């Protein structure tokens, strides 16, 4: 690793406001926001160093573990699962699923232009296909059919500034009966009155949209740069029709 990172530990910053300075071995200093993923992915190892190690992001591990555990509880092994990974980034979630025995195909999608390049650089061969763009622009039906997909996953992809409820439901309904859903989302999604996405999740929990929610747990997603915890929920569900 030919860089070090200085985190801005100012209190009270929103997730999208957190900043850092990357100091390279040649003396260059690069200032960026944490959510400038394109700039993060351009530096090999930077995302893992900051998000996974320094800020202790647990979403990929929690999502993968919860999904595989629920599959086992329902008498299914993970090996044949074939996954559409939404907001796939440089492949951290896909790698965690692979480590837990998912041997089927992974298809990634991300709206960050540099994500696919970073995923192939950091985790070569993990994805059989990697699509650039918004989920709403993707023909999910054709992708599901082409790769015979049986799972939809997304770590942190749901919430304000990310995928809308209607867009997500349009994608989820293209999956076959018995398909698995695994997502993590900020706790505010479930706790805010009048939130479209929160109302959608509530409908899923009530058995709506041909979905059975079988796990919904709160967990510490990661630390803020100032040290306070950020909490998310992990949801595991199945398609019933």
Where are these regions (language model features)?
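Conserved beta-strand signature within the Rossmann-like core of class I S-adenosyl-L-methionine
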Residues: 178-186
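Conserved alpha-helix/loop element of class I SAM-dependent methyltransferases that forms part
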Residues: 57-79
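N-terminal auxiliary segments of SAM/dcSAM-dependent transferases
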Residues: 1-33
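Class I S-adenosyl-L-methionine
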Residues: 207-241
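A short SAM/SAH-binding and catalytic strip from SAM-dependent methyltransferases
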Residues: 149-164
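A short glycine-rich, Lys/Arg-flanked "PGG" loop and its adjoining helix->strand segment in the class I
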Residues: 166-177
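A short acidic, Gly/Pro-enriched loop at the edge of an enzyme's catalytic core
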Residues: 140-152
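Class I SAM-dependent methyltransferase SAM/SAH-binding core
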Residues: 84, 90-140
């Amino acid at each position: 690793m030919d860089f070090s990172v200085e985190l801005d530990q100012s209190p009270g910053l929103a997730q999208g406001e957190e900043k850092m300075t990357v100091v390279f071995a040649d003396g260059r200093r690069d200032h960026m926001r944490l959510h400038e993923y394109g700039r993060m992915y351009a530096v090999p190892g930077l995302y893992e160093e900051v998000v996974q190690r320094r800020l202790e992001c647990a979403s990929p591990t929690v999502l993968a573990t919860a999904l595989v555990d629920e599959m086992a509880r329902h008498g299914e092994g993970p090996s044949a699962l074939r996954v559409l990974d939404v907001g796939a980034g440089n492949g951290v979630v896909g790698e965690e699923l692979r480590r837990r025995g998912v041997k089927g195909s992974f298809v990634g999608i991300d709206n960050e232009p540099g994500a696919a390049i970073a995923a192939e650089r950091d985790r070569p061969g993990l994805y059989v296909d990697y699509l650039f763009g918004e989920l709403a622009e993707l023909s999910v039906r054709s992708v599901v059919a082409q790769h015979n997909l049986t799972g939809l996953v997304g770590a942190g992809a749901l919430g304000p500034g990310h995928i809308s409820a209607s867009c997500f439901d349009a994608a989820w309904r293209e999956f076959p009966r018995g398909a698995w859903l695994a997502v993590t989302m900020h706790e505010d999604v479930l706790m805010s009155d009048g939130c479209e996405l929160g109302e959608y999740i509530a409908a899923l929990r009530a058995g709506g949209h041909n979905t059975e929610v079988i796990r919904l747990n709160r967990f510490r997603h990661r630390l803020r740069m100032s040290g306070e915890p950020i909490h998310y929920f992990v949801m595991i569900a199945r398609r019933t029709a």
